[in-house]
Amino acid sequence: QMALDVGAQSFGHWSGCHSVQWDFNSPNFGDRNIADLFQKHSYPFGILVNILGERFLDEGADFRNYTYAKYGREVLKQPQRIAFQIFDEKTKHLLRDEYNIPQVSKVTANSIEDLAEKIGISPTILTKTVSEFNNSIVDTAFNPTLLDQKRTEGIFPPKSNWALPIDTPPYSAFAVTCGITFTFGGLRINSRSQVLENDDNPIDGLFAAG
């Protein structure tokens, strides 16, 4: 804002950002000992629900490499800016290392009802969500290494790949929010990193990078 106030030219897509699912209880500032392990990127192998107990996106739309940078923003749109990634015991071995750090926001329970109570969601609604999801899964082979088309039918949002029933206790829920890595908007610069005015002339002594 200080640069804009002295006449710097804005540039880029200011309403967009690189946004990931980030541990809800992570600190406000980074920890070099943990680095990026507060991210939570194994969501394709479970379901994602908001505080109302409702799914709100296709967890298996594509490999996480192609969805993780935009799904954080979808969490940001949810009530209280929080969501829960839910897994059961049979997918536990598929979770990335970041799910095992001591600081992780994790809740476990032996039933969906108990899990819901522990994370502050209506047990009735979460049980209904999980039941509808489980009953909608097409009976095809599961393969985590490819787009296996093991999908749901008849529910919205769908899950396009890696749809396994959530039916094997214990169940785990990981609280996530949106972590913004960087925005897509900034200041226009030239090849020497000088910040430009609206007429494309450089502002003396003002440089930008990053």
Question: Where are each of the predicted segments found?
Answer:
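Residues forming the flavin
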Residues: 1-148, 152-210
